[in-house]
């Protein structure tokens, strides 16, 4: 179905940003990131969501690490050697830039109208009414 393909494309685009956000909150290993992503996306659409798998996440983590956005350090969890990820300074700058862009989007009347229409939700109607007066 076209709608499923479009939704998958949208979630794939957000996955990198969400991974950075998750890592910004705590040093976390790949499996922990997968669990957080499952929690994040399943709350959006539990009946349509397929669990995150390692074949999707670890290539993203390797790419982010290779480009210097995150760094991995080996540690032990449950008697297993695991790699814990954290943001580098470059990663923190990138995430801050994403936050700034996101703040700009959600404060844009056109984007806000789009989000409200697509979600049947009046997210900031009171705030927007106050800004207009």
Predicted regions and their residues:
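Beta-hairpin "wing" of winged helix-turn-helix
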Residues: 65-81, 86
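Basic, amphipathic "hinge/linker" alpha-helix immediately C-terminal to the N-terminal HTH DNA-binding motif
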Residues: 81-99
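Amphipathic alpha-helical dimerization/coiled-coil segments
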Residues: 93-133
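Intrinsically disordered, low-complexity serine/threonine- and proline-rich regulatory segments
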Residues: 1-13, 98-108
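Short, hydrophobic-biased segments on the C-terminal half of alpha helices
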Residues: 58-65
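N-terminal helix-turn-helix DNA-binding core of bacterial DNA-binding proteins
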Residues: 8-56
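Short, contiguous hydrophobic alpha-helices characteristic of membrane insertion segments
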Residues: 8-9, 61, 116-120
